[in-house]
Structures are given as C-alpha cells and as structure tokens.
C-alpha cells in the first residue's frame, strides 16, 4: 500500500491549507470511463467543514493524474458532509449525498457548477419514528440517538433513476434523474417526483449490477441483500465478518467487493470502549446471475 496520489496530498494536519490535500476522504468511486472520483467532505468528526476545503476530485486511472477538482463553497454550508457519489459519464453529471443536513448535490461536470436540491424533503431526512437497533441496543453516540440523513446513493445502469436513502432508517427512495438535472424546474415539482419505495434494509452504501439488481448491506444483521428490478428484497449472504458493510465496487468479471467500516464498534457508540478488530478487511464474492 502507498499514499494516493502522493505523499503531499496525504500530508494534511490541522492548520494546513486543505484545498489541495485530503482532509478526510469519505468515498471513492470508479465510473464507466475508468476515472476515479474521490469525495473529501473536509469535515473532521462530521462537525464543521475545514477552511472551505470540501471537494470532489477526478483522477484519470490510466495516468493517475488529477483531471478536475470540483468545489462547493457557495453551495454547501460549513455543517455539510458530502458522503457518497455516483457519476453519469454519458450525461456528464455527478450526484452526491449530504448526510449531515440532508440533500442531493447535482454537479454539471461540463460547466463545473453545482446545486443542492431536495434539502427540505422528508426523503433526505431520518425518519423520526424509526428506532435504530444495532448489536441488540439502540444506536447512540455519547448517550444520544444517532440520526443521520441522506447517505447511500446508487444510479441505475441506464442513468435514468437515482436511488438514495438516509443512513439511520430503513426507507428507500428514488427519483428520475431528469428532475434533478433540470435547473429550471420549480422545487415543488421536483419534490413531487420523489417516489417512496417503502421499508427495506438499514444500509450504508449500495450499488447496482448490470442487470439492475440493487445490492445493499444490512448492517443490523451482518448481511448483504439485494433488491430486484421488481423491487423484491432477497438475501444474498449473511456472515459475521460483515460488520457494517459500507461501500462497494463491482468488477467486470462479476465480483462484488465490500469494505466493512465497523462503525458500530467505535468508542463513540460503545461508552468509550473500542470494539473494533484489526486489520480492516475488504471482502469479495462472486455475484449470482452475472
């Protein structure tokens, strides 16, 4: 293992200029054209954005060189936390979730402009009626229930639908992407286009396969599930090693790669006791029907 793309980008310390350094990378994503996208919310401990350093960085994996850096100073507040990203290379649009405040950030990759939409819609907010149980107890941080907003995000293979959900409840939503891309559309019409698909799994990240199956981690039960194109929920695998399955990548030879972040084992959620085990692991499994 080595720092990517180099030591300088990985050298940030508090007090440094973070505009061209990683402050706290949250997610990575490889698009259909073999570009790597790195999400840096620049918000240590999810408390406050550091010195306007929030960014989305595009790398060409053929050269490992930066091609673009997208910044959000006039779009996001200093309490925001951009969490995950999906990129439509055909339409040249990126979609990101804001998990601190709730919202979908839409980036026009050709012009570099961005907007945040659905900010006040229930679909990007934790369901207040839902009590999150993990490891047999209510999930709390320093004694308070944890409520996080829009987090997991996935784009259908044809780019027509964006699926998303809050981190700490079991609801799943989707919206046609043309409602997100249309800058002239009034907010109320965009919000009316959101579809509530119902209650499924409490998941962090999620990803579509080429057949339109949506894979989700069920971090309450250490397992992986999938939602078929007909919106039928199926169990894929249960394994005690799947401790908070978090992010995913799909290979061209039909393997799903899974990173497990063990968030529920961190001291903040266990009265100061660190229950994590090392080393952290990335797992893979051959997917059915691929």
Regions found by a protein language model. Give the residues of each.
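Beta-propeller fold detector
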Residues: 1-14, 67-71, 115-130, 182-198, ...
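Beta-rich, blade/repeat-based domains predominating
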Residues: 13-39, 75-94, 124-161, 169, ...
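Asp-box/WD-like beta-propeller blade repeats and closely related beta-sheet repeat scaffolds
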Residues: 22, 43-44, 49-93, 97, ...
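Conserved beta-strand positions in repeat-built beta-propeller and related beta-rich domains
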Residues: 38-42, 96-100, 156, 164-167, ...
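Short, solvent-exposed loop/turn segments at conserved positions within beta-propeller repeat blades
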Residues: 47-54, 99-100, 167-168, 220, ...
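Short loop/turn segments immediately following beta-strands, especially the blade-tip
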Residues: 109-114, 121-123, 174-186, 287-290
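Blade-level signature of beta-propeller repeat domains, shared across WD40, Kelch, NHL, RCC1
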Residues: 249-290
